A protein has these predicted regions:
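Electropositive phosphate-/nucleotide-binding environments in soluble metabolic enzymes
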Residues: 22-25, 29, 37, 57, ...
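Short, well-ordered beta-to-alpha junction loops that form the rim of enzyme active sites
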Residues: 139, 167, 261
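Active-site beta->alpha loop and helix N-cap motifs at the rims of alpha/beta catalytic domains
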Residues: 1-144
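Conserved short secondary-structure transition element at the edge of the structured enzyme core
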Residues: 200-202, 239-270
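Catalytic alpha/beta core domains of metabolic enzymes, predominantly
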Residues: 128, 142-248
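A general structural signal for well-ordered alpha-helical segments in protein cores
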Residues: 3, 28, 60, 64, ...
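Structural signal for hydrophobic packing residues in well-ordered secondary-structure cores
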Residues: 13, 35-36, 40, 68-75, ...
Length: 270
């Protein structure tokens, strides 16, 4: 259900900064229809690229509900519900379940710098409180917290924890986690540049920034890699390499929102 290219969709904002800034619902709907038409395999709402850290809890729930309602079951919706407060993560995950999200993506608690045991207890508390499929999210470059493979394997035994978005670009971790957590545990990358190799090492797909602007190419590349067509996947991967790099010339999501603005999908607000 959660394989292939899953877009880490941006959250379109009406131009403005401060209390007058609002979610641009028509632009969001237009983007979602574009992704469904282009073959995107799932939508990830309010993740890092969706500016989860700057949305209020109310805005989080509004965006998740809007996306679930617009998509209307045509492809899966994964809701970003992580927080550096366990109570807030539980609250956001509850909201996602109530509005009909198919799964949740929970980033490691940022800024707090928890121990591995602290990470285990945090995720265990969320998983045991809310009955919805949950995907761990490890992105130490953004959080100053690295969830190690042994901790991920340990968490894989808990009901409702179905996989991990492993965004370190450390391909050695794919086999470490796969060997420990088993074949059914979902392994997703968050690094567009290494997606092809991640899948060929045994991963299941990507939660992608690049898919915001090249959804069909990312979907096709993932499908080729998953089918074992190394040459076909490599050809598409080579075509996408420059785009991957350009979308990270500044902090995500600044470049990708700039491109979407230039393409006419969204207004200029970040």
């Amino acid at each position: 259900m959660f394989t292939g290219s899953m877009v880490a969709i941006v959250t379109p904002m009406l131009t403005g900064v401060g209390p007058d800034t609002k979610i641009d619902s028509p632009a969001l709907e237009n983007l979602l229809e574009f992704h469904i038409e282009q073959g995107t395999d799932a939508i990830v709402a309010v993740g890092t690229t969706g500016e989860s850290a700057t949305l209020t809890e109310e805005e989080h729930c509004i965006v998740i509900k809007q996306i679930v309602d617009i998509v209307n079951g045509r492809i899966p919706v994964i809701a970003g519900t992580g927080a550096n407060s366990t109570i807030e993560a539980i609250s956001l995950t509850k909201c996602a379940k109530e509005v009909g999200a198919d799964a949740c993506l929970l980033v490691t608690p940022y800024y707090n710098k928890p121990t591995q045991e602290g990470l285990y207890l945090h995720y265990k508390a969320v998983a045991e409180t809310i009955d919805i499929p949950q995907i761990l999210y490890n992105v130490p470059s953004r959080t100053a917290c690295d969830m190690l493979p042994d901790t991920i394997v340990r968490l894989s035994t808990i009901k409702n924890i179905i996989g991990v978005k492993e965004a370190t670009a450390d391909l050695a971790r794919v086999k470490q986690i796969r060997n420990g957590a088993g074949a059914d545990f979902l392994l997703l990358t968050g690094d567009d540049e290494t997606t092809k190799d991640f899948i060929l090492e045994g991963g299941d797909g990507v939660i992608s920034v690049t898919a915001n602007v090249a959804p069909r190419a990312m979907h096709e590349m993932c499908m080729l890699a998953l089918s074992g067509d190394i040459d076909g996947a490599s050809n598409l991967d080579d075509m996408l390499k420059d785009l991957h790099k350009e979308l990270f010339v500044e902090s995500n999501p600044i470049p990708v929102k700039w491109v979407l603005h230039k393409l006419g999908f969204i207004q200029a607000g970040i």
